[in-house]
Amino acid sequence: MYKEINKSGLLNSAILILTLISTNEIIAANEPVYKSIYNVNHGALIYSHNHGQNQYLWADYAHNLSGDWKANANWNLMYNSDGTIYFVNQNSGLCLQHYGTNYQIVEHKCTGSHEKQKFNFELISSGAILIKFAHNSECIYMSSGIRYYSIYSDVCDQTNKDFYWAIVPPLAP
């Protein structure tokens, strides 16, 4: 009988441990997981000016983003039930959004269901990813300016490294 009680105790302990682990994962899944969006060709990160809705997004080198600006380059990757993702900026709380073909990308109030805020990733042979709008399959790309980089959308071009991205650890504020 002692062996039966001992086995039952082990089983109950195992169930308790598994319950605690799975509960911890659920709690952790509700925490924001910030990342930065890094252009492989230029080595710059997409950031928000944090000036409100319908403002253009830009990119700069990590060493140029200091103090509170570091969090402007951090994005929470949120998953939609349809398999797409959307990006929420850590400081502004706004989402990356398509504005128009050959126009700069803007940030706007997040809805989670706005078609122009939904993205898919496409892994390419170099190991980089293309970040594609789900509603029209256009990709975001980085264009170099004189003092900073601009972020645009256009037809995807796998041969143009301006379209190559990586999701990297966030900048620490």
Model-found features: residue ranges?
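Sec/Tat signal peptide C-region and signal peptidase I cleavage site
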Residues: 24-28
